[in-house]
């Protein structure tokens, strides 16, 4: 399975499922289909769940995942902020700036995944990133990519 931190460098895409605890938000995730690379899965799953087109994708980390006894592969993916068209898999999805996300977390209006989850780790990695960490997403042409 894959889980992805989708960002334009300044905003992050988070979603929530109706079955989750109230106020819980997380990253989008999905299962790899036969014949598909993990990177292709990231692009497909983000599109299917949110209608957002992803550009560059890079692997970050993995975590053993108990259901269905597998491995969760964590990715970062570039996508310029764009309108969201949620699928029936999600109750809601939204782009959040670092300032917005910090405020919602501090007020208790948004709950992150459990502290030991790869989802939480990827969100905090993005939230704590400084300008030097965001260079990856900017090119001379103004589109996402590696310098």
Spans of features found by a protein language model:
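Surface-exposed, charge/polar-rich loops and edge strands
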Residues: 36
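Hydrophobic alpha-helical positions that pack around
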Residues: 28, 42, 46
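Peripheral (non-transmembrane) domains and long loops of multi-pass membrane proteins
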Residues: 49-51
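N-terminal strand-loop-strand
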Residues: 1-27, 31, 53-58, 77-79
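Nudix hydrolase/Nudix homology domain
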Residues: 21-25, 86-147
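Active-site lining segments that contact anionic ligands and/or coordinate catalytic metals
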Residues: 54, 60, 70-74, 90-91, ...
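Active-site-adjacent beta-strand/loop module that shapes the phosphate/pyrophosphate-binding cleft
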Residues: 63-87
